[in-house]
Amino acid sequence: MKTILVDDMLLDLQLFELKCADMPDFEIVGKFTDPNAAIEYAAGHVVDFALLDIDMPGMDGIHLAQALRRLRSDIIIVFATAHPKFAVEALKMKADYIIFKPFDREDI
């Protein structure tokens, strides 16, 4: 699956990448600290799977996921968050899965 990773924290983004790097089903095609850059990329490329942080300044992960779903309704959305309070919002927007930071590779 063509995968994008989005987190405003560079270290967390690198951890996302490390945990997905050798998984045969994932081809990381984009890594973004700016949600708008992720939307711009997804508008011009095939993206099957998005691993998103929720709590980001400016555009949060919920709004990013909604924008990605407008571009491609069947994109798989997985949220990674350290804040359980965001789980309800993620479920309301019909996220495919929510994982809590810190997470293990098996959680993806």
Language-model segment annotations:
Residues 1-2:
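Non-catalytic signal-transmission and effector/linker regions of two-component phosphorelay proteins
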Residues 8-9, 54:
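Generic detector of well-ordered alpha-helical packing
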Residues 9-30, 70:
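Two-component/phosphorelay signaling modules centered on CheY-like receiver
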Residues 35-108:
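CheY-like receiver
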